[in-house]
């Protein structure tokens, strides 16, 4: 650069970024060595401010609506230019990274940030390659300018901040927001659009593998247990949130983890606890007077986070990929207290529950959500991140399950014995015992009983689990009230599913109101 021009740091190290972030006052060093940063008013994603540029190359393949909102191509170019001009006067951080741990399906990404801690986040969450863009692909660009204030009347945005994806130009623009999760979810959305065209199923799931190479997937919305359950001391982690399932195997889309921190404990989540050290970014975590993180403090948000590279986990799959999965787990957090802790699904039921995506928003990751826990249906267990119509992903899932003969399970990490506020939530040790039975294969052909209203098969016994918990009616003091709530939930499933054009076999696989 010319003399006097602001510096640009290319591929800076974690130590450099921590040092600069502290010098600039972007964050504080904690007692465990992590860097804690605050994101201001926006402590979660801002779905109302997320757009996709409407242009000929992708327009026909995107399901436009409240999730995927169109943005004018000319307005995007003008705004990109304004943000670039703003950043030209700033000290910048640039890294050459990749998204997708697969030689065929990776995307090269050049990430430019105004903040040092945002660059540390990107380097933790994306993949640092030995040789950047070895396949000479078109390079994606992310620019993240939290200090740029959007003007809706000038820029065509919804507010003072914006997230825009542009498939034709391979660009992601983030302006006016500090919440770092927008960066990772933007590139997830990009891969969710591109991978299906190559016959690869992109998934909002975690994945781990056993000593014998047996892979398990955990689908679920934020707060349902993806990160916690995949961080198993007895198994090797592939990744905690974003994966692709191609013919022959599963690969991580990322190079790090973005774990929820609320109520984190060393006893229940030792793998995550030990990963939080120097180089980790703690987002919106409160500290005590000795700089010790207080993970119980939700005064800023329920959505406090830790972003760390996979290298911080001792028991990980170094290749960042695994075999095709023998077991697939759909995690649901049922606030009604009606669903059993585990059900064994047929292929048709798997398609039904994948499309339904029934769960709860727990410590919601989205701005504008109340702190109250509420039930929701989120297609593919990740509706905010999937640009194509839901049927595209469901068809790919059925195809992959059938070709590899994977067994799918529905696991409730929510409530039993009554709805939220009356019943109690399944504890982590109980769910871990269920998952142990799933990954061992002992549940696949276990004797079951059929729950008529829910149309689900539940095992009669699981080692290490109180058998009275397995049929949820046993945990309710008032059996008539259980029947009422079960019927009500079945009706909610049916009315939500009415919008899908699917085979009669899949329609009949749902609850019977």
Swiss-Prot record:
One MF term in the entry's GO annotations: ATP binding
Residue positions binding substrate: 45, 179, 185, 305
Entry binding sites for Mn(2+): 185, 204, 241
Cofactor(s), by name: Mn(2+)
Enzyme Commission identifier(s): 4.1.1.49
Cofactor note: Binds 1 Mn(2+) ion per subunit.
Pfam family, one: PEPCK_ATP
Entry's Gene Ontology BP terms: gluconeogenesis
Enzyme's top EC category: lyase
Pathway where it operates: Carbohydrate biosynthesis; gluconeogenesis
Subcellular locations according to the entry: Cytoplasm
Reaction catalysis annotation: oxaloacetate + ATP = phosphoenolpyruvate + ADP + CO2
InterPro entries, A to Z: PEP_carboxykinase_ATP (IPR001272), PEP_carboxykinase_C (IPR013035), PEP_carboxykinase_N (IPR008210), PEPCK_ATP_CS (IPR015994)
Subunit record text: Monomer.
Protein name, UniProt field: Phosphoenolpyruvate carboxykinase (ATP)
Gene: pckA
């Amino acid at each position: 650069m010319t003399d006097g021009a602001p510096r640009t740091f290319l591929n800076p190290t974690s130590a450099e970024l921590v040092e600069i972030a502290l010098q600039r006052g972007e964050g504080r060093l904690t007692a465990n060595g992590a860097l804690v940063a605050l994101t201001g008013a926006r402590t979660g994603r801002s779905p109302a401010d997320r757009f996709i540029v409407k242009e000929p190359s992708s327009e026909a393949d995107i399901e436009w609506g409240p999730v995927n909102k169109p943005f004018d191509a000319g307005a995007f170019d003008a705004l990109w230019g304004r943000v670039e001009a703003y950043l030209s006067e700033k000290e910048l951080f640039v890294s050459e990274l990749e998204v997708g741990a697969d030689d065929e399906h990776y995307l090269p990404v050049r990430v430019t940030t105004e903040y040092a801690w945002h660059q540390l986040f990107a380097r933790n969450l994306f993949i640092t390659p030995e040789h950047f863009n070895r396949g000479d692909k078109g390079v994606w660009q992310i620019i993240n300018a939290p200090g740029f204030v959007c003007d809706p009347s000038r820029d065509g945005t919804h507010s003072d901040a914006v997230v825009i994806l542009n498939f034709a130009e391979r660009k992601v623009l983030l302006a006016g927001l500090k919440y770092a999760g927008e960066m990772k979810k933007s590139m997830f959305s990009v891969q969710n659009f591109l991978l299906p065209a190559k016959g690869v199923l992109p998934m909002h799931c975690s994945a781990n593998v056993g000593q014998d190479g047996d892979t398990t997937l955990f689908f679920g919305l934020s707060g349902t247990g993806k990160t916690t359950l995949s961080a198993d001391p007895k198994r090797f982690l592939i990744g905690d949130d974003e994966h692709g399932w191609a013919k022959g195997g599963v690969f991580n889309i990322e190079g790090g983890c973005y774990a929820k921190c609320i109520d984190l404990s060393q006893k229940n989540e030792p793998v995550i606890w030990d990963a939080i050290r120097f180089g980790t970014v703690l987002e919106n975590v409160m500290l005590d007077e000795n700089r010790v993180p207080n993970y119980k403090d939700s005064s800023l948000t329920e959505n406090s986070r830790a972003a760390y590279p996979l290298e911080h986990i001792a028991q990980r799959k170094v290749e960042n990929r695994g075999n095709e999965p023998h077991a697939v787990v759909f995690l649901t957090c049922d606030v009604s207290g009606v669903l059993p802790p585990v059900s064994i699904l047929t292929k048709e039921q798997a398609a039904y529950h994948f499309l339904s995506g029934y769960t709860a928003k727990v410590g919601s990751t989205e701005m504008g959500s109340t702190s109250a826990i509420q039930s929701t249906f989120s297609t593919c267990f990740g509706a905010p991140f999937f640009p194509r119509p839901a049927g595209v992903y469901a068809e790919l899932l059925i195809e992959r399950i059938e070709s590899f003969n994977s067994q799918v399970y529905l696991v409730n990490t929510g409530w039993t014995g009554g709805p939220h506020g009356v019943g109690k939530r399944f504890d982590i040790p109980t769910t871990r015992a269920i998952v142990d039975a799933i990954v061992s294969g002992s549940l696949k052909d276990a004797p079951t009983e059929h729950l008529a209203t829910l149309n689900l098969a539940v095992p009669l016994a699981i080692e290490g689990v109180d058998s009275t918990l397995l049929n949820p009616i046993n945990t309710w003091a008032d059996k008539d009230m259980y029947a009422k709530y079960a019927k009500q939930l079945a009706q909610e499933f049916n009315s939500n599913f009415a919008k899908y054009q699917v085979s009669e076999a899949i329609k009949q696989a749902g609850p019977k109101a």
